[in-house]
Amino acid sequence: MNVIPCSINTLKGLYDISGVEVGQHLYWQIGGLQVHAQVLITSWVVIAILLGSVTLAVRNPQTIPADGQNFFEYLLEFIRDLSKTQIGEEYGPWVPFIGTMFLFIFVSNWSGALLPWKIIQLPHGELAAPTNDINTTVALALLTSVAYFYAGLSKKGLSYFGKYIQPTPILLPINILEDFTKPLSLSFRLFGNILADELVVVVLVSLVPLVVPIPVMFLGLFTSGIQALIFATLAAAYIGESMEGHH
């Protein structure tokens, strides 16, 4: 007789658990829009770091580069090589886009481990890396989608949509679905890896002394850089694919 009440209580408990959010959020009301303030604040910090670093490095350019200028020239060469490898000979106009994606994601990922976000007190929630929030990663993935649609349409015009019936019209639904899964895979891969890395570090710090999680933090820095590289590489590959001829 007690089976039904127990089952109801169990289901109620599972329902309550399903409503629990991962962390709390601080929102701003700007006009009629509700803005996620934590992501906005940390994104501004990351952008300020990037702009400040570049300004300091190139404010007095030298014929023979040194220090910061040398580093950023090497970084530019790396991004150009990456873009050329994935896009092809028409890579030039896309270097700024790929470079912006790579640098923003890279600095955002590292900021989660290197910047003391926790010391900044908020009315609700706490600050974390911008890429620790699904809103940021989805926005970056959607920008990538817009970029490769623009690349394909600007290169081929309306004939770009002919790829959806290649090599046979039977594959039309699958080819359309593929364009929707690209931004989903980009966003969830980046979000999942960064969130998991920060959660592992937080759990280890709460369970064991500070020295023990340090190797995990270094591993997190390495994987954060790899995730930025993967995102930029796939973005360039999608753009290059949209500009290729049908096979």
Curated annotation (Swiss-Prot):
The chain crosses the membrane at residues 38-58, 95-115, 134-154, 199-219, 220-240. This is ATP synthase subunit a, chloroplastic. F-type ATPases have 2 components, CF(1) - the catalytic core - and CF(0) - the membrane proton channel. CF(1) has five subunits: alpha(3), beta(3), gamma(1), delta(1), epsilon(1). CF(0) has four main subunits: a, b, b' and c. Belongs to the ATPase A chain family. It comes from the Eukaryota. The gene is atpI. PANTHER family: ATP SYNTHASE SUBUNIT A, CHLOROPLASTIC. Coiled coil: none annotated. The lineage of its organism: Eukaryota, Viridiplantae, Streptophyta, Embryophyta, Tracheophyta. Its main location: plastid. Keywords: ATP synthesis, CF(0), Chloroplast, Hydrogen ion transport, Ion transport, Membrane, Plastid, Thylakoid, Transmembrane, Transmembrane helix, Transport. The keyword Repeat does not apply. One of its GO terms (cellular component) is chloroplast thylakoid membrane. NCBIfam families: ATP_synt_6_or_A (TIGR01131). The keyword Transferase does not apply. It comes from Lemna minor (Common duckweed).
